[in-house]
Every structure is written in C-alpha cells, then in structure tokens.
C-alpha cells in the first residue's frame, strides 16, 4: 500500500500529489482487472481449442460437449431404450436432448423426448420443447399430458451460475438437484431412472435419503468426459418404486 504524500504540488491546481497517486492507483487497478479478464478469456479459449470433446461435438453434430457425458452414462446404465420417454430439465442448448432423441428413436419410432427450459432452444428433430419453469407446480402434469405417459428417465445437467464461492455454488446447484428430484417423483413411471448434476461433496443427506427411499439403487459417477478440474458429479438413481 502506498504511503500518503503531502500535498506539496502547486496549490493553483487544487490537486495534490496524494490525489494524483490515488488516481494512478485506481487506473492501475482498472488495467489489472482488464488484463485479468483478457487472460481468463484467453485461457477459456485455449481450453476449448485443446478439448477433444469440443472437437468431437462439432464433428458429430452435438450442440455441446455435455452430450458425451450422458452418452457415457447411458452406455453404462442403459437409460434409453427404443420407444421410451425422457424428460430433460434445463435442456438448452440441447446436447442431452439430442442424445435422448437418437437413442430412444424419437424421430422414427415411438420414443418421446420432452425438453424444458426457461431459455429459448433451437428445435431438435424428435424433441418436444417446452419453454417454461420446471419449478412450476403444474409442470409435471403438463409434460405427462404432452407425452401421454410417464417418463422412463428424468435428467438434469443444470448448475446454478457460479459465484466463485465453493460452498455457495454447491448449495445452489444442490437446490436445483433437489427440485429436479421432486419433479422426477411426479413424472416417472415405476422402474424409471433419475440423473442429475451435483458438485463434489456429494448429494445432501436429505436428498440422498429421499432418493434411497424412492429408488432401488442410488450412486454417484463422474464421467470421463467431465473435465478433470471440474467439481461436478452426477447422482444416478434407478428402479423407481413409484
């Protein structure tokens, strides 16, 4: 921290050396902040350019690298069966919905995918998009009416906007996971599955107990396609008891 200087400059201007220093300090802080933003943006761009899943998503026609996470989890747990019904909460930009539509046969067979988001989402062949808040009490009923049946899987890749404070980010994303689970309880058919993003630290005790009471099998998984530095995990619950 710079020491305060005596105002020994010309009294005619009304600006002392101390005022000039403070202005200089403020300007340097602005420059440092601007540089930090530029460096952060550069690092993000470098990470994107060097990420094999970003390149693969462009090549394979997926809207986001997140598509490979649900592909990996489905390869292991077999969520998507041809002719089944899936609900994607917080679906934009649509990577998970794309995978669900492909694997359920939503374009040609009797598979059905409902994608829900409060943001706009570009249309996807075989996907029925609903622009609404899934927290609305009537949302599960609206989706059931649209699909004409209950879902085989309810999935959510939602995360709250990051604040940089780890505990706050964890709690906010956990709140979304809990709300998604309650939606699933209303929308799933017996034997169905639930998959949602959480952060390291795992699922809260209350939610974990609810899931264990409602499903036959509950576990966590971090897909290989998740970035190594990411704190995300996925809670996977199968064999819904109804």
Q: Which residues make up each language-model segment?
A:
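Conserved class I S-adenosyl-L-methionine
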Residues: 81-92
